[in-house]
Amino acid sequence: MAEAVERTDEMVREYLLFRGFTHTLRQLDAEIKADKEKGFRVDKIVDQLQQLMQVYDLAALRDYWNYLERRLFSRLEDVYRPTINKLKTSLFRFYLVYTIQTNRSDKAQEFFAKQASELQNQAEWKDWFVLPFLPSPDTNPTFATYFSRQWADTFIVSLHNFLSVLFQCMPVPVILNFDAECQRTNQVQEENEVLRQKLFALQAEIHRLKKEEQQPEEEEALVQHKLPPYVSNMDRLGDSELAMVCSQRNASLSQSPRVGFLSSLLPQSKKSPSRLSPAQGPPQTQSSAKKESFGSQTTKGREPAGAPKDGKSLFGGLAPGESSWSQHRQRRLQDHGKERKELLSMTLQCAEKKPEAGGPEAEPCPEPHVEALETLTRVPTAGPEGGGVRPEQPFIVLGQEEYGEHHSSIMHCRVDCSGRRVASLDVDGVIKVWSFNPIMQTKASSISKSPLLSLEWATKRDRLLLLGSGVGTVRLYDTEAKKNLCEININDDMPRILSLACSPSGASFVCSAAASSLTAHVDVLAPDIGSRGTNQVPGRLLLWDTKTMKQQLQFSLDPEPIAINCTAFNHNGNLLVTGAADGVIRLFDMQQHECAMSWKAHCGEVYSVEFSYDENTVYSIGEDGKFIQWNIHKSGLKVSEYGLPADATGPFVLSGYSGYKQVQVPRGRLFAFDSEGNYMLTCSATGGVIYKLGGDDKVLESCVSLGGHRAPVVTVDWSTAMDCGTCLTASMDGKIKLTTLLAHKV
């Protein structure tokens, strides 16, 4: 509700300004500034009560509570009156305990002097009048509970929850219902998008099934063209059976050697015996094994080649006494028909692999075979080397699009919370905000006069962008109005804003400011740009209020102030993890605003850090090229460690003609997870690479190589707001690839 009230205030203010009602606007601003209800923000109301207690202003505290009773609590039913009275009693007791704890017994005596007439007839206050005169009230059995930290925290939480529920249940005017309508509209749009993606997937499946129905006829025609006429009507005949058939042939064919089906098939497909040795086992075992491997390639209920009709024509000349043997033969033909097609499928697969081996007898597979095989699998090439397809591949690539409106290397590329818009920033200070559904379209564009180093979407108001510069400022940019709302100066001594992270609650954001880089004082053409130690400069980590745009506090960075390269919140904003230039990961408790733990994580700088899906661990990538998982319940406990290629961790190098070389140190996110945290997207020299996490191996298993880039990818993002995940990969040539993936549900 607080968010809806805030948006409504802004809309009313904008309307009054549009109409020219400046006097009314000034009056509105004055009343909003003096608003005792704090825009229905529960945290602000509770803070106001605590502030009045801290200055011992009993009269103001009592007046403020009476105001809340008159404006808010009076709307409740009588059944909630006892709860309100208990909260009021606890509030006054909280005030009394605070006066005793701060050695202000005079304020406690003043409280009873002013409240005696009201409290002396209440049984719950009978024992409290002696409180100011006790030497050690915190040890008294009657009052010990109220002096504990647990009781104070419980009271604050109870008051907070009571006000939250009250605001949610309050009847609101019609103008405030717009927020609910917007949410319903967004939900309907999301459902429509999900249904559209499902329809797209079903259409692809129908197309695949139609291709599968056409494939057997193509395979049959191909085999009959290659094999002798009598073999095309038989499946794996034994020598004794073949002898009977030979007696029915013409004179020219009767001179042929008596061989089985496999011995006739092998020379035609140029298969080695070792490749087909499993096919010589029992028919039932072979058939069941192939069903598991190629279950998606065969269609049940189809009539196999070599049907009983063919068997009749072949054995039509047999004596009547042999009719039972003919029926047995027809059944065997039916049993072997399906196995033959499965064997042919394996033949196609092996024929595709043989040219890769580079053998002297390898032949390119005919075009109809390749097309049929690709239609059957319907999965993209797996692995960074572009190896063969695998039926267990976890994702299906539905499509890949390119956003090419940047003309220099990308630094940041982030999807907003709704998964509908993307904000991208390049090294020239060009910001682009664009959508990709249903079509790719630029929504806003801006060029910064000062260099920009960091970018972050605001969580609650996803139309706003936070932009950190290289001159010590943070800018709040409205992507819909296409203008800067405000610009704040962080620190002149720490001009580089390296990282921004907005709390999931939307009430605050953290800002990492650092002194000028060491590379600013050396030749920019030196070959060691981006090497170790270039960012070993002092830094600060600051907490700012999103609404007021004022600094709330500065975090302590032990053992000494250092530049913080990356920051990330957990899902509720209670924890903040940071990676610094000294290789240390620090975990901050955002409720106590202090560092809960820290440990040396990497040799060199920490480039990127994120919470895991269950938030029991954090992952980090460092300058040492390692991807490490850490347990946050035990400081410095390493869960797993993997080595990554140099093109996944940076610094990133783009080489050109005449010895030209462009080097870029990592700025944006280097890895991102899918919706369940089982797979990870990373950078590479030619595109994004998806790895499977949680395996027992000591190396990461590469699942999908997205490809599509001609320059090194420097930052990635993975949006899972829809059923179909969207992977973003941005490279040093300014190209951004948007790949749509469909998870392969098992």
Swiss-Prot record:
Keywords: Coiled coil, Endosome, Membrane, Phosphoprotein, Repeat, WD repeat. This is WD repeat-containing protein 91. Belongs to the WD repeat WDR91 family. It comes from Bos taurus (Bovine). Residues 265-336 are annotated as: Disordered. It is found in: Early endosome membrane; Late endosome membrane. Residues 265-278 have a biased composition (Low complexity). It comes from the Eukaryota. WD repeats lie at residues 405-444, 447-487, 514-554, 559-598, 601-640, 663-701, 708-746. Functions as a negative regulator of the PI3 kinase/PI3K activity associated with endosomal membranes via BECN1, a core subunit of the PI3K complex. By modifying the phosphatidylinositol 3-phosphate/PtdInsP3 content of endosomal membranes may regulate endosome fusion, recycling, sorting and early to late endosome transport. It is for instance, required for the delivery of cargos like BST2/tetherin from early to late endosome and thereby participates indirectly to their degradation by the lysosome. May play a role in meiosis.
